[in-house]
């Protein structure tokens, strides 16, 4: 997904990374019908078939996606999306299934009307093809307008609850009070809070301006002072939040799996958490000016 992350991952490295995940203590993997135009699910499915199936107790989460050419996202497309995903993954059902990115559909009414894609999502759950269903997207205002009108088990939001952007705070509070499981994605702001501002000067899948990188550089200085990897700070900012059920962080190398586990369990001093509260964070939409390119 070079347009999203700025680089590609070859087949061999992807397989090695997946096997490291399946062999370790991690028990949750998130993907989507349209990630890499289906290549993500295909790679996961190939790895699972080679292993003889999904490890016991492992949770696969995927997402229903619109037709990527027409933008159509009616009930028929939702069902087709599921069928494509099950075939690629080589499974009969998934543990978690989200409706994905309605903000990019050609007609929102196809999704929300009676008999639309959302009704199809809950029908899929009733049929036992998904254990839990959710809404996965970015735009908070649209997410909130949909979220309370259906009995979602979960939500997934990205890039809007991390050390440098806290715009999802209000929505997460309301969702938690209603008992909706919160899956917080992109704790590294799409990479800069893991690899650093010099290596990965991108925020929310876009090249970041000098001004946008200022809080990142300030955090890097604080982390260096305390001898703490900025990735550990970014990851634990999410994992220590009692409202958040699970944090979805991307890994593209086998060694990143163990690094993520190390970051998640690293002991961070109280002084660090106190100091970062003095850093300016954004409450604005991090994708307001993004030129979206699917895949």
Region annotations inferred by a language model:
Residues 1-58:
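N-terminal binding-site loop/beta-alpha segment at the start of enzyme catalytic domains
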Residues 8-21, 74-88, 138-145:
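Short, acidic/polar
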Residues 23, 45-56, 86-91, 146-150, ...:
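Acidic (Asp/Glu)-rich catalytic clusters
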Residues 51, 55-74, 100:
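Structural motif corresponding to the early beta-alpha repeats
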